[in-house]
C-alpha cells in the first residue's frame, strides 16, 4: 500500500516541526505492518518557511510561490492540490491513499497501524476538528469529487462531509467531534494540541471573510442546522437536496469523477 502524506503550512514552524516529529516517530511501527510505503510532502504557502534539518532529506516540499504572504487561507484549493499531486489520475492512480493534514496535527504513536485498519474499513476518513486530518482514496474522490474551492475559509469541510454521507455513506467515517459531525465513528489517527494564542493572530485575518463562505454553504445546503452538530436525520435530508451548479476546474483530473452531471457540474 502506497501512502502519500501532505501537510499544509500555516506560518507556524513550531507546529510544523512538532507535526513532523510525531509523524516520523510513528515510522518506528512500520515493521508491524506489511507492504506499507509512505511518502511525506509539505505544501508550503509562505516565504518564512523552515523545518528541522533532520527532516529535510525525508520530505518533499511543494512551494506555492504564487500565493503572496498577505493572502488568507484557501484550504479547499490546497486539499485539491494534494489530491491531484498525490493520485495524479483517478483512472490510473499513483498511490492508494492521500492523507492530508494541517500543520498543527499531533499524530498518535501507532498512527500507521491505525491507518491500515481505517483503510480496511473505509474509503474516506476525517479525524478530530474539521479537516485536520483526512484520508482520501481514488474511490472516494471518484464518488465524492474534489473539494469546492468556492469555500475559501471555513465551512468547506462541512460541505465535503455532507457530500461524503450523500454519495458514499457506508464507506465514509467522519470523526469531527469538535463540531458534532460524526458518522460511522472509528479509531483516531491524531489530535490537535492545546491552542496557541500567537497562532490565531494570523488566523483572525481570515475570519474577516468567513461570512462569504457561510453564504456559499447556505446557497448549497439551504439550512443552518446542517452546519455544526448534525441533526439525527442528516442523511435523509441531504439526499433530498438538489446540487447547485458547479464548474470543473481541473478537467485533466475531474472528468473521472462519477456522475458529474448528477452532482451539478456544468458539462
Per-region residue spans from a language model:
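Conserved donor-nucleotide/metal-binding helix-loop-beta segment in metal-dependent transferases, i.e.
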Residues: 109-128
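Cell-envelope/extracellular polymer assembly enzymes that use nucleotide-activated donors
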Residues: 2-4, 39, 159
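Short, well-formed alpha-helical segments that are part of the catalytic scaffolds
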Residues: 12-28
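Active-site-proximal specificity loops/subdomain of glycosyltransferases
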Residues: 48-95
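Short beta-strand-to-loop acidic/aromatic patch adjacent to the donor-nucleotide binding site
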Residues: 92-106
Amino acid at each position: 500500500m502506497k501512502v502519500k502524506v501532505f501537510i499544509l503550512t500555516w506560518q507556524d514552524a513550531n507546529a510544523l516541526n512538532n507535526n513532523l516529529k510525531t509523524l516520523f516517530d510513528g515510522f518506528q511501527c512500520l515493521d508491524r505492518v506489511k507492504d506499507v510505503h509512505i511518502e511525506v510532502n509539505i505544501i508550503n504557502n509562505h516565504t518564512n518557511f523552515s523545518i528541522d534539518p533532520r527532516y529535510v532529506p525525508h520530505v518533499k516540499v511543494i512551494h506555492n510561490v504564487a500565493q503572496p504572504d498577505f493572502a488568507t487561507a484557501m484550504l479547499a484549493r490546497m486539499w485539491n492540490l494534494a489530491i491531484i499531486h498525490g493520485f495524479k489520475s483517478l483512472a490510473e492512480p499513483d498511490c492508494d491513499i492521500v492523507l492530508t493534514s494541517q500543520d498543527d496535527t499531533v499524530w498518535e504513536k501507532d498512527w500507521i497501524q491505525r491507518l491500515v485498519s481505517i483503510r480496511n474499513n473505509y474509503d474516506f476518513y476525517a479525524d478530530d476538528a474539521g479537516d485536520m486530518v483526512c484520508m482520501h482514496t481514488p474511490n472516494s474522490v471518484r464518488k465524492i469529487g474534489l473539494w469546492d474551492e468556492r469555500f475559501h475559509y471555513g465551512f468547506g469541510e462541512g460541505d465535503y462531509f455532507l457530500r461524503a454521507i450523500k454519495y458514499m455513506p457506508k464507506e465514509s467515517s467522519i470523526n469531527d467531534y469538535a463540531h458534532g459531525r460524526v458518522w460511522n465513528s472509528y479509531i483516531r489517527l491524531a489530535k490537535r494540541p492545546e491552542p496557541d494564542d500567537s497562532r490565531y493572530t494570523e488566523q483572525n485575518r481570515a475570519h474577516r471573510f468567513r461570512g462569504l463562505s457561510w453564504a456559499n454553504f447556505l446557497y448549497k445546503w439551504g439550512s443552518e442546522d446542517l452546519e455544526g452538530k448534525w441533526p439525527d436525520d442528516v442523511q435523509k435530508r441531504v439526499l433530498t437536496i438538489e446540487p447547485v451548479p458547479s464548474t470543473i476546474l481541473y478537467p485533466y483530473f475531474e472528468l473521472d469523477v462519477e456522475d458529474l452531471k448528477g452532482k451539478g457540474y456544468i458539462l
